[in-house]
Amino acid sequence: EYFIGVN
């Protein structure tokens, strides 16, 4: 959730 598509 810290980057679009990454967590």
UniProtKB/Swiss-Prot annotation:
Domain of life: Eukaryota
Alphabetical UniProt keywords: Cell wall, Secreted
Keyword Secreted: yes
Location relative to the cell: Secreted, Cell wall
GO cellular component entries: extracellular region
Record protein name field: 42 kDa cell wall protein
